[in-house]
Amino acid sequence: MNWWIDQYKQYHAELNTNYPGNNLKPQLHHIVDLVKDTKAKTLLDFGCGKGLQYTKWKHHEELGVMPELYDPAVPEYEKLPDGPFDGIYSTDVMEHIPKEQLPETFYKIFSRAEKFVFLAICTKPAIATLPSGENAHCTVEPIGFWVTMIERYSPKRVYTHVKTYGNCNNYTILNEDMYLEWYLEQF
């Protein structure tokens, strides 16, 4: 088993309040806009935590569709759905993934995405520490790093929004031409 995932499984098991899914709400308006703009019908929340954003807070009602859920550290959601999905989003997840595992992670995300990807990434150390004592944010980098990683390791071009927050607040859109081409085909 992956050492990092094992650490997160232990962390999730410690308290019901550890990573419940509360990082979706601050990003929800961006994702709702993407769902509407692309007319997305199928979604994947990549790194959903315990999923309370759907079971308790009902954020899927704002999205207009219930997404598939994936989180390798939560037994109920540890199997990655095959897809494809119109949209894939991940909020406060990428910074928890070691740099050496990012190529595989981006492959998993971008190979399944058809219309859009939204990534919200924190750029400062976490408050949380893992059972090992390490900071939960092992990859704290500015937006330029993330754009380079996406461009280098995505198996295909996908309309992508990247938002960073924390010590480096930024927002960029990649492959906007993909959306514009799709949009023009609608008329």
Regions found by a protein language model. Give the residues of each.
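A short beta-strand submotif of the Rossmann-like class I SAM-dependent methyltransferase core
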Residues: 87-93
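Conserved N-terminal segment of class I S-adenosyl-L-methionine
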Residues: 1-87, 103-107, 112, 123, ...
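Short "lid" loop at the C-terminus of a central beta-strand within the Rossmann-like core
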Residues: 122-128
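Short glycine-centered segments of the SAM/dcSAM-binding site in methyltransferase folds
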Residues: 115-118
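A short His-aromatic
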Residues: 96-97, 101
